């Protein structure tokens, strides 16, 4: 069967003008005009999609099939062009019968030309073929326009769905034009309104927690630049958290003398029940000479230093992908779960804006993976946000998964982010050693986002940076009061 592209070539019908006219009509539709006014960042993203639309329309016209009736009429027309005038006169009754049988628009005009002229001259022969060709051109143009109109309706429907999705997610995920473009590309998937409303919900939660968004911005761009202090610059106060040995209940390290009743050795506690030794017990208690368990660990204190305010010689640093590990244990449920998911959404926003990859891993008893910056990023984000945090804590598996992924060439400059309350067992020595090797030899940076003030320092000491967001009731009330 004849294709429409072949028919256009045979009749010298140009579809380019019709395609451009259809694109302009689509862009001028009221739906797109209103959308562009409301979301100007997405206008460039939609405009960048125009070449793909043109190519899709050309492909549709190229592959379309011509109806059998029109194909038969075109074949008859081509054969008639090869006939001389005497031969054409002989074939004329069959040609008229074929036009009548095919219900050709040229039938009435063909009969009029033959019946109104008693003699069929060569000039009439030429006129007959010219008008027949003109009729075929009109039919081909009409067929092109019908197909383009069908495609326009389908394209407008698809664009409206993507506009609705992109418009809903633009406040949450599109920070700049680059992010808006990537968001528009992601919107090409098959999503329903109820699906992406989950992202809108967590976006609203993130907007209600500006400190969490600010923390994600600081972490996401903490590698952006390196500054060299300028000489004789004014100084400013700079506060950092430093580790130091402290007596915190992390591990038993031996025996010491003291007055801590809760950590008394059983023999010392037994003397309290002997009448003759009771006063001796109190004397040693006052003098802090009772034998107690010695528990050592690490604590954090705030160190105040000064640094220059003015900087120069900014050296841009490479910004690689994010590998984000999220603790899905039972202790991370409730408000912690909301904060962890919203924080990942904020990192996705940073990744889209800076053209970076954002890879999420959930660690509990198993490791589940999502890539939020790929072509199916929106679907992946919805699946991630739909997860429930009800498992156990296996932070060692999380680190092993990070280490394995960082072996790939495409992750050579990745930053690892671990979101947890860090209430877990100590890390195995081999994991600690491998993390240190990645930090030392490959300049990988490991960030901890601590959702609790009670995380074990023994676990957190391996991180380059610790970002604290206490989700306790007291801290939540203080943050709300400060706003």
Curated annotation (Swiss-Prot):
What's this protein's family per the entry? Answer: Belongs to the ViaA family.
* NCBIfam families per UniProt: PRK10997.1
Which InterPro entries does the entry link to? Uncharacterised_CoxE, Uncharacterised_ViaA, VWF_A, vWFA_dom_sf
- Tell me the HAMAP family matching this sequence: ViaA
Q: Name one Pfam family in it.
A: VWA_CoxE
Lineage of this protein's species?
A: Bacteria, Pseudomonadati, Pseudomonadota, Gammaproteobacteria, Enterobacterales
Primary gene name? viaA
Q: What does this protein do?
A: Component of the RavA-ViaA chaperone complex, which may act on the membrane to optimize the function of some of the respiratory chains. ViaA stimulates the ATPase activity of RavA.
Enumerate the PANTHER family for this protein. PROTEIN VIAA
One GO CC annotation = cytosol
Keyword Chaperone listed:
yes
Supply the alphabetized keyword list: Chaperone, Cytoplasm
**Coarse class of the protein's main subcellular location:** cytoplasm
Assembly information from the UniProt record: Homodimer. Interacts with RavA.
Say yes or no: keyword Cytoplasm present.
yes
Subcellular location(s): the record lists: Cytoplasm
Q: Which domain of life is it from?
A: Bacteria
Question: What Gene3D superfamilies does the annotation carry?
Answer: von Willebrand factor, type A domain (3.40.50.410)
From the Swiss-Prot or TrEMBL record, give the protein name. Answer: Regulatory protein ViaA
Q: Which organism is it from?
A: Salmonella agona (strain SL483)
The record's section on SMART domains has: VWA
């Amino acid at each position: 069967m004849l294709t429409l592209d072949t028919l256009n070539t045979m009749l010298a019908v140009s579809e380019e003008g019709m395609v451009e006219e259809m694109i302009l009509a689509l862009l001028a539709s009221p739906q797109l005009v209103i959308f562009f006014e409301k979301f100007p960042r997405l206008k460039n993203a939609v405009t960048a999609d125009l070449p793909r639309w043109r190519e899709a329309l050309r492909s549709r016209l190229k592959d379309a099939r011509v109806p059998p009736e029109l194909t038969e009429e075109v074949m008859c027309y081509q054969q008639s062009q090869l006939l001389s005038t005497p031969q054409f006169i002989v074939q004329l009754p069959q040609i008229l019968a074929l036009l009548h049988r095919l219900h050709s628009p040229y039938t009435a005009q063909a009969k009029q030309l033959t019946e109104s002229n008693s003699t069929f001259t060569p000039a009439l022969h030429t006129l007959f073929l010219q008008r027949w060709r003109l009729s075929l051109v009109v039919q081909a143009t009409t067929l092109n326009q019908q197909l383009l109109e069908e495609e326009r309706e389908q394209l407008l429907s698809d664009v409206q769905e993507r506009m609705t999705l992109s418009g809903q997610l633009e406040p949450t995920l599109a920070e700049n034009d680059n992010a808006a473009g990537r968001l528009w590309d992601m919107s090409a998937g098959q999503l329903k309104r109820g699906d992406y409303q989950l992202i809108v919900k967590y976006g609203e939660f993130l907007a209600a927690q500006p400190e969490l968004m600010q923390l994600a911005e600081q972490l996401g761009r903490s590698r952006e630049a390196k500054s060299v202090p300028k000489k004789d610059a004014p100084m400013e106060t700079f506060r950092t958290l430093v580790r130091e040995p402290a007596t915190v209940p992390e591990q038993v390290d031996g025996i010491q003398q003291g007055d801590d009743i809760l950590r008394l050795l059983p023999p010392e506690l037994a003397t309290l029940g002997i009448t003759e030794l009771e006063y001796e017990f109190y004397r040693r208690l006052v003098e802090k000479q009772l034998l107690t368990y010695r528990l050592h660990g690490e604590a954090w204190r705030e160190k105040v230093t000064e640094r220059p305010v003015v900087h120069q010689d900014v050296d841009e640093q490479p910004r690689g992908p994010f590998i984000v590990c999220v603790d899905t244990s039972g202790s991370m449920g409730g408000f912690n779960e909301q904060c962890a998911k919203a924080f990942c959404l904020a990192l996705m926003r940073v990744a889209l804006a800076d053209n970076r990859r954002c890879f999420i891993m959930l660690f509990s008893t198993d490791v589940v993976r999502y890539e939020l910056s790929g072509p199916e990023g929106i679907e992946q984000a919805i699946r991630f946000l739909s997860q429930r945090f009800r498992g156990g804590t296996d932070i060692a598996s999380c680190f092993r998964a990070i280490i394995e992924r960082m072996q790939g060439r495409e992750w050579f400059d990745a930053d690892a982010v671990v979101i947890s309350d860090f209430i877990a067992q100590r890390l195995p020595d081999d994991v600690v050693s491998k993390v240190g090797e990645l930090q030392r030899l490959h300049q990988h940076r490991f960030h901890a986002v601590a959702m609790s003030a009670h995380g074990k320092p023994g676990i957190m000491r391996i991180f380059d940076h610790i970002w604290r967001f206490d989700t306790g009731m007291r801290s939540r009330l203080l943050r709300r009061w400060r706003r």
